[in-house]
Amino acid sequence: MGLTKIASKVFLPRQKELERHYINPEKIQHHVLKHLVEKGCETEYGRTHIFSGINNYSDFTKNVPINTYEELKNDIDRMRHGEQDVLWPGLIKWFAKSSGTTNDKSKFIPVSNAGLHRIHYKGGADVVALYLRNNPQSRLFDGKSLILGGSHSPNYNVEGSLVGDLSAILIENINPIANLFRVPKKQTALLSDFETKRDRIARECMNANVTNISGVPSWMLSVLVRMMELSGKKHIEEVWPNLEVFFHGGIAFGPYRKQYEDLIQSPNMHYMETYNASEGFFGIQDNPDDPAMLLMLDYDVFYEFIPLEEVNAESPTVVPLEGVEIGRNYAMVITTSCGLWRYLIGDTVMFTSTKPYKFVITGRTKYFINAFGEELIMDNAEKGLAYACKETGAQVLEYTAAPVYMDENAKCRHQWLIEFSQEPDDLKKFGDCLDHYLQQINSDYEAKRSHDITLQHLEVVKAREGLFNDWLKMKGKLGGQHKVPRLSNSRKNMDELLELNQE
């Protein structure tokens, strides 16, 4: 019996347990809240907010405010200096470095031992459990996993404490048995210089029997392309004939799908989306025919949701899981065993089902364009680009968009800077298709575009090859979990990129 067959039997009880998500979702979530509040009683934060007096969800909402990173920053800084029992019991040794706030270059998200095992690793195990359930003929464990991670560094002078990309923290603490199935070597996986790392990963893994790959689509694509260059082959299956699945997350896969399908032409290749972030592991695509993800309810994560239109209100409506509506955009609020209490994570989601609870990621609360009342979100952008690519034979590698508030002719428009891996047959047609489709799916954008009065036709600027990587490198953010900001009301990133595009 092969290793995968043995593993499938090991995962069978969990596969059955996950069926509870269909039967008692609200009950599961309220058990999670009870557990988190009980643990929180042992902390300074819990004493300040009278956790001992919390007996139900209503008490919880009265005693605990909605928090952004700024509200928790001082407590997190104290934890980084070794203080214990601040937001979560005990000493927190690991901090996941995430993209920054208005006031800081980076956020440092605490990762407790409980969070590591009861959120992040549990999520990783469930991805495998659901994949094996859907693919009984899999030979996943008969080869190696290529896990693309970031890097880490010591945290102040706290012994054994680390700061870095979440992926690096996960690799550093991985179960020794799981480590036997992973490539590349840990020293390579945790290198900080992405260009060096990409080359070494390609060289180390080229002759391995890789059956599955995990990572952010943009960075993984870069590694695969480098491996093709070194091997002299055209398609991945010529190097890894047993590759069967890409577990991806971090950014939308849509703009990269065609490039992966061109590179990996095996009919047996699968793609499975996960929603794992520095703050936690939240969703898994449980059905390959449905792009929506199953909300994972029995981890150490309690969920709440704010209607997107109220996210900046002084007293927004906040609902638990049972209060969500299908088809509505929500900002997600989480409470976790990493000491994040009613934390506004910054992502926006839309539920497609409540039996079970399934959702799609629609964007970021800070990544949108609403300069003229058009309310363009990332979900609109991704769908518009996918349509324009389909109509013109293009493939998008990276992009960003920002408003032009008023040019020399007193005209306003959206400006899109796009790096193509496959240029469109006709750039003007690409822009027309994008503009047309955005009007089809966003009535606010359509209204502002009406008769070119408020908004002119969007502008597409072609980025030179490597522009976005050069920009990220200039900012010390090449590789790992760093992402190009897609949409912004500010022109700061756009102006920097346009200037760099001339060099």
Annotate each PLM feature:
Residues A129-A178:
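Conserved AMP-binding loop of ANL adenylate-forming enzymes
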Residues Q84-D85, T101-G115, E238, V245, ...:
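Non-catalytic, beta-rich accessory domains that mediate macromolecular interactions or localization
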Residues S99, L148-G149, S214, Y275:
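Short glycine-rich loop/turn motifs that provide flexible caps or phosphate-binding loops at active sites
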Residues T101, S106-V111, K122-G143, A381-G393:
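Gly/lys/ser-thr-rich phosphate-binding loops in alpha/beta enzymes
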Residues F95-D104, A277-E279, F351:
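Ser/Thr-glycine-rich phosphate-binding loops at phosphate-binding pockets of nucleotides
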Residues M1-S52, F60-N67, D75-R78, G82, ...:
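Active-site glycine/GP-rich loop and adjacent strand/helix microenvironment
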Residues K27, H31-F95, S106-V111, R118, ...:
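Active-site diphosphate/adenylate-binding microenvironment
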